[in-house]
């Protein structure tokens, strides 16, 4: 199981929170103290919280559950897309559209339209259109790809959300709460932990820190999937041995 150590977290500055004047009092249990008017996060809480969440995600991947990676702010967007794609999980990294979970039927229609446009682009339909019409469809495709591209293969609601910066993604969390979908969240000292089932107190702004968390969750997914594949291989071998 891929685990993250306190040293790993210290190296990327996970312990640095926000300026003390911007703190959320609900994060008090996770704060070690303050240095130069910056809150310091108690990594004694972060390490077990993060590793327990990684174990949960690994087990979910073993059971072929879907983990939706969510991080739309600049510090997280690129990493969310890369690591979710690497682990074969859905993601939202541009902008959370209201109703992405609670109005999934409408979202499904948009995904269908995205697929239609992708087919038209690849089969030469765009080439037969007027320049203006082709340009309009290309723009529509780009817009849909930006907002829906990461969830087009999700095939239904996710089983868990992994969120970087819970305040920034509050709409996503509220939708998940409404549907009873558990939420794993990286929660900084200025954030409200309400609605987050698995709170990971940590810096959510430093790019290297975000890369560490998101990469670890992608690794956990891959390890869970590999464990499932390994079990399937063993089953085949046992069956063959029995038949022999």
Swiss-Prot record:
Ribonucleoprotein among keywords: yes
GO molecular function: structural constituent of ribosome
Classification via InterPro entries: Ribosomal_uS2, Ribosomal_uS2_bac/mit/plastid, Ribosomal_uS2_CS, Ribosomal_uS2_flav_dom_sf
GO cellular component: cytosolic small ribosomal subunit
GO biological process: translation
Keywords: Ribonucleoprotein, Ribosomal protein
One Pfam family linked to the record: Ribosomal_S2
Annotated family: Belongs to the universal ribosomal protein uS2 family.
Protein name according to UniProt: Small ribosomal subunit protein uS2
Organism (species): Marinomonas sp. (strain MWYL1)
């Amino acid at each position: 199981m891929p685990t993250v150590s306190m040293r790993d977290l210290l190296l990327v500055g996970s312990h640095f929170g926000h300026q003390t004047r911007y703190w959320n009092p609900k994060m008090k249990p996770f704060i070690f103290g303050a240095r130069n008017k910056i809150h310091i996060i108690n990594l004694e809480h972060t390490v077990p919280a993060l590793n327990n969440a990684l174990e949960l995600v690994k087990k979910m991947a073993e059971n072929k559950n879907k983990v939706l990676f969510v991080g739309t702010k600049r510090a997280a967007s690129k990493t969310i897309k890369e690591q979710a794609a690497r682990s074969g999980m859905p993601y939202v990294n541009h902008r959370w559209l209201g109703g992405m979970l609670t109005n999934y039927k409408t979202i499904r229609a948009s995904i269908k339209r995205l697929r239609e446009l992708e087919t038209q682009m690849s089969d030469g339909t765009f080439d037969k259109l007027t320049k203006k019409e082709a340009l309009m469809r290309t723009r529509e495709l780009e817009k849909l790809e930006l907002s829906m591209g990461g969830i087009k293969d999700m095939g239904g609601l996710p089983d868990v959300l992994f969120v970087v910066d819970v305040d920034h993604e509050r709409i996503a969390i509220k939708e998940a709460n409404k549907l009873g979908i558990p939420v794993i969240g990286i929660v900084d000292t200025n954030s409200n932990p309400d609605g987050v089932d698995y709170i990971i107190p940590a810096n959510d702004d430093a790019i290297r820190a975000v890369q560490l968390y998101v990469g670890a969750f992608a690794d956990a997914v891959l390890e869970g999937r590999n464990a499932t594949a390994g079990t399937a291989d063993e089953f085949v071998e046992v069956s063959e041995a029995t038949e022999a």
